[in-house]
Amino acid sequence: MKLKQRVVVLCAVLFLLGLAKVFLLDGGEGSAASRRDLRAFRKMEASLSLAKGARLTHTLQSPWEVAAQWVGPREVYPDETPELAAVLNALATAHVERADVGYKGTQLKALLVLDGGQKVVFKPKRYVRDYVVEGEPYAGYDRHNAEIAAFHLDRILGFRRAPLVVGRFMNLRTEIKPVATDQLLSTFLMHGNNTCFYGKCYYCRETEPACAEGDVMEGSVTLWLPDVWPLQKHRHPWGRTYREGKLARWEYDESYCEAVKKMPPYDAGPRLLDVIDTSIFDYLIGNADRHHYESFQDDGGASMLILLDNAKSFGNPSLDERSILAPLYQCCMVRVSTWNRLNLLKGGVLSSAMRQATAHDPAFPVLTGAHLTALDRRLNGVLATVRQCMETQGSENTLIEDRMNLPHP
């Protein structure tokens, strides 16, 4: 082959390789990384629907023991969980052995112990589904359905960092009051024919109780993480001040991410990329209230950022609070696997997946059509933000290969 022909062939090969890279970066299937991500996506799609009323096919372990064994440093549950539907069904139906106030936090909740000694958090329904929360993006009561939807979004995104959540209808008169502590019982009252309680928390008031319809209250049940995995609380580097007229540094300093990169645990390991993943997750659900976050203790910075307390979400489907994405657009970096997953979810796939994932939840419909539409719209905003970063600094500086999978102990 003549030199000129060789040069032409080489140029053609380089051109095709460049096209393949662009194809990958826009959600294609051209590399080993993208093929792996596509296989993971197809696996998620296949397991998305959860059978109604499922039960474990064996009796060697309780549902709680099964779920406890799933937890590892980088995941709350693995990518293959054939028992997930059975565990969620147990959460939605198991007998309540004890009920107490939920002491920590600012919002109303109850701490329950289910049959077999499993602790769970019950968050009551405060709004009808189509209620729009006005005001600040973190305004309003907790939304129980937001906890449910956020868990399933965690599944869809492939993060697997959120505790298990399911909807449940609880009879306060027959299931809760007979096993309630005196402290919880003292907060029960009647509004007409409806049984209500206001619990104990920073913002809990007798004048603002949560009320059942008659005796039956809709809510969400969140599975308590195993005690062998104690949590450590961290101040979120992109947290808000919650004080009128006072901005956090990230709100006025566009170079703030460079300062964060010099602080542990963000100067090494996966934590900063976890924060960026979380900003995408929170933007999609409209959660502007992640002022702190939890990881596992004594992790040396290797633990995942656990997606706890997602109830200040899905408040206003018309509001896309871009400031939630500050970690993404200020750091201008994101995991390749996250980028590939987001591209596979565009074009209405995300909202369709959410409908499918929540179809058999006891609290279905979990989200209104307006909130499902907002998910797809916000996803487009995330993709546009990443593309802008790639145009500014190149894909090689924006898309980070980080697939840290730590083995279970």
UniProtKB/Swiss-Prot annotation:
Its cofactor is Mn(2+). PANTHER family: DENTIN MATRIX PROTEIN 4 PROTEIN FAM20 (PTHR12450), GLYCOSAMINOGLYCAN XYLOSYLKINASE (PTHR12450:SF14). Pfam families: Fam20C (PF06702). Belongs to the FAM20 family. Keywords: ATP-binding, Disulfide bond, Glycoprotein, Golgi apparatus, Kinase, Manganese, Membrane, Metal-binding, Nucleotide-binding, Signal-anchor, Transferase, Transmembrane, Transmembrane helix. ATP binds at Q107, K123, T222, L223, W224, L225, E294, D309. It comes from the Eukaryota. GO terms for molecular function: ATP binding; kinase activity; metal ion binding; phosphotransferase activity, alcohol group as acceptor. The chain crosses the membrane at residues 7-25. It catalyses: 3-O-(beta-D-galactosyl-(1->3)-beta-D-galactosyl-(1->4)-beta-D-xylosyl)-L-seryl-[protein] + ATP = 3-O-(beta-D-galactosyl-(1->3)-beta-D-galactosyl-(1->4)-beta-D-2-O-phosphoxylosyl)-L-seryl-[protein] + ADP + H(+). Coiled coil: none annotated. InterPro entries: FAM20 (IPR024869), FAM20_C (IPR009581). It is a single-pass type II membrane protein. It comes from Danio rerio. Its EC number is 2.7.1.-. The active site is at D289. One of its GO terms (cellular component) is Golgi apparatus. Residues 1-6 are cytoplasmic. The gene is fam20b. Mn(2+) binds at D142, D309. Responsible for the 2-O-phosphorylation of xylose in the glycosaminoglycan-protein linkage region of proteoglycans thereby regulating the amount of mature GAG chains. Sulfated glycosaminoglycans (GAGs), including heparan sulfate and chondroitin sulfate, are synthesized on the so-called common GAG-protein linkage region (GlcUAbeta1-3Galbeta1-3Galbeta1-4Xylbeta1-O-Ser) of core proteins, which is formed by the stepwise addition of monosaccharide residues by the respective specific glycosyltransferases. Disulfide bonds join C196-C211, C201-C204, C257-C331, C332-C389. It is found in: Golgi apparatus membrane. One of its GO terms (biological process) is embryonic cranial skeleton morphogenesis. This is Glycosaminoglycan xylosylkinase. Residues 26-409 are lumenal.
